[in-house]
Amino acid sequence: MSHEFSPENTAVLFEAMKQEQHNRRRRVPMERRRRVVLACFNCKARKVRCDGANPCKACASNNLECTYPVKDEKEMDYSKDYFIDLSKRYKCLEYIVERLCSTKVSTYTTPSLIEVCNRISNQKSLLSSDVFSLNSESTNSQRDVDTLTQGALVCSQIQQDPTVVAEDTNNGINADASDQSVDEIMKLIGKIKVDSNGESRYIGASAGEAFVDSVQSELLVDPSFSELSAYSHTHHSYPPNEHDVNAVQKALSLLPPPEVSDFLIKSFYGHVQANFFFFHETLLRYRLNLIMSFQNPSVDPGFLCLLMMIFALGSMFAHMEIRSASNPFDNPGKQFFDTARLLLPQVIQQCKPSLVQASILMGLYLQSTLSQKSSYTYFGLSLSAAVANGLHRSCENPNIDPKTKELRNRLWWSVYTMDRLISIATGRPLSIADSECDAALPTVVPELEIEGSASNVHNIISMSKIAKIMGKTMEQLYGTVNYKKNPINIIESLRADLEEWKRSLPPFQILENLDAEDPLFRANVHLHMTYDQAIIIMSRPVLLHKMKNAKNSPRVDRINEDCILAARHLISLVHLLQNHSQLSCYSFFDYNYTFSSALVVLLHCVTEPCEEDDIAMQYAYSALDYMAEGNEAAKNCARVIRLFDAHLKGARSDGNGNTSQSGFMAWQRWIAEVSAKDEPEKLMSPYNKSIGGGRNSNSLTPNANLGADVSFFPTDDTSFLLDHSKLDDDLEKFASTLDPIKTTPDLANDSSLLNWANTDQGMDIEGSWLGNMHPTWLDYVCP
């Protein structure tokens, strides 16, 4: 039975109760079934009529003890769902009465409410304000707390700890009436206001305007009192200056011809908006057609800025529309992006939902560059604008139609999801708490569906739900206030949430059911990549613990195994996308997830090298090399992974090298040290030349193949926007430190590589290990 209150559920509940009463109805009334119900044991044994007296005539005449069986009444067998539904119905009706009558119903006892009903039944005409005024004296009576208000709390807790409910109930009964009215403060909630132009803005509960509105509604007779209403000002707009006009004209001149714009729009909606929502395609094409149909159109700068970003991102993913196409050139769509930046000041000044849409797309565009801080700033601007427009709250304003509400919800959950995913990837705090968001999840609205296009509403829902879990991971596992808690328990709880998310996926999103020809194939694969990434993020902190401790509890081993399997599986999904030409060299999540999983696999190779890891790394290198062709950030990730791999191969070779050869090297070193005491100049010179001087591949025995690994780092790459000479010097300096006489490479004292590391606070895992809760890649290199 559904728990939501609706007329349909009411009818179902009524029919269920009728059926239950019918099942309990006996064909013969209970009072007439005397021989079955009222016969004593003696009469029943002798099969004679019993008159039901105590004692009966038969027992009295025979001087026998007259005993009747205990009546076994059938207990009420209502289900838990029934009481939950009934409790919700009660709360809904109570809320309606409180809104209509402005009276706290829960402060009245049941006899008082019965008295109110009796009195108002005699009134021919009745106003809502008169309902409880007719029984004002009942407000002075003792006000009990109705047990029905406990609702699901009673059903779920009374079996576990009956004292909890009893204590809460007693506290409510003994509470002072004035204390019970404190929850009236909760009426001061945030609200969304819509002006005459249709622009919305959010007013939080702590704002002065919200308090003015409360005073106005509670104390004033006329709610349209002009002097107070003047406080509710609309957003002022300034006339455009010369720079603004020139920016609009430049954007209009950059609009591509219809054939090109149609191609770019198709590319954007097919690859960028697959798991998110930014703007409705039908509305976009309609407004674009209006602009193209007039010579000097009056254009909204916000929509024009959004249009430029759609064309910019469509240009980025254009190569995926033609599978045989090679990557075009660096920074595709840069002209559109630069023009959108010129328009952005006007869009910020307007602060409409178009600012939310344009700024989040700007952040996405910059994710494929090395301007990561700028990208994060655009994401923050997008979320702030969304909150300013009230997208994060449930909208009950009658001035906003249902379709607009649905589009607002879809946009909000896309912004929310992006905030969670980017915050996790960059290690930055979440921008908004879940407790502040009560906007409804998206739903399928037939009027908003596009004929001939696959609906991605379920993808938005699935991404929003897993983003919530990743947000919990950030708060509970990586939050600074949780270092004293047991992370193993937290990880297992989060892992259970992930499994529940996976079980709730609709059939067409299950990995085994995916079809490469489905328009949402890439989007659905991304859902499962995000699932694997969530496992990696929540279980990665125990990897170093696993390496440092030979003996671990089964719980730690299980979490470690989950992390390794998730990393391999994620790389296999990346390889799947690459095989079907669905891997984008400009997608942040494609290269970031590949980089994250490759780190885990390489770390596992140190302790337990296996063929599965070698295959996974081949796939990872292939994908990173492909994405590095047009993505500066991906190129950076590929460099770091190869540096990481080269060092770990050196560590493995030093640890697993030929014992005789290692002994020979130790003997030679000892001879040199002893002889140096007598003839330092004669003996130390050839020793330094043969052991410490040469840095070619032959001198790196037993790791003779290391030269090939280091050769992956080109020194003539001019497209890498970091300090190229410094990075390549770092790589050469790193290669020179790989001395075979060392059992562990000395990265800890390499100041050039320490620049990659961050200082982090440790935490206690199972009360015995102080590890790095936020491990950088250097922590994996030097476990």
Swiss-Prot record:
InterPro entries with a match to the protein in the record: Fungal_SecMet_Regulators, Transcription_factor_dom_fun, Zn2-C6_fun-type_DNA-bd_sf, Zn2Cys6_DnaBD
Gene Ontology molecular function, alphabetical: DNA-binding transcription factor activity, RNA polymerase II-specific; RNA polymerase II cis-regulatory region sequence-specific DNA binding; sequence-specific DNA binding; zinc ion binding
The keyword DNA-binding is annotated on this UniProt entry: yes
Annotated region of DNA binding: 40-66
Main localization, broad class: cytoplasm
GO biological process: DNA-templated transcription; positive regulation of transcription by RNA polymerase II
Subcellular location(s) of the protein: Cytoplasm; Nucleus
A single cellular component GO annotation: nucleus
Keyword tags: Cytoplasm, DNA-binding, Metal-binding, Nucleus, Transcription, Transcription regulation, Zinc
Short name of one Pfam family: Fungal_trans
PANTHER family recorded: PROLINE UTILIZATION TRANS-ACTIVATOR, REGULATORY PROTEIN GAL4
Name of this protein: Uncharacterized transcriptional regulatory protein C3C7.04
Protein species of origin: Schizosaccharomyces pombe (strain 972 / ATCC 24843)
Lineage: Eukaryota, Fungi, Dikarya, Ascomycota, Taphrinomycotina
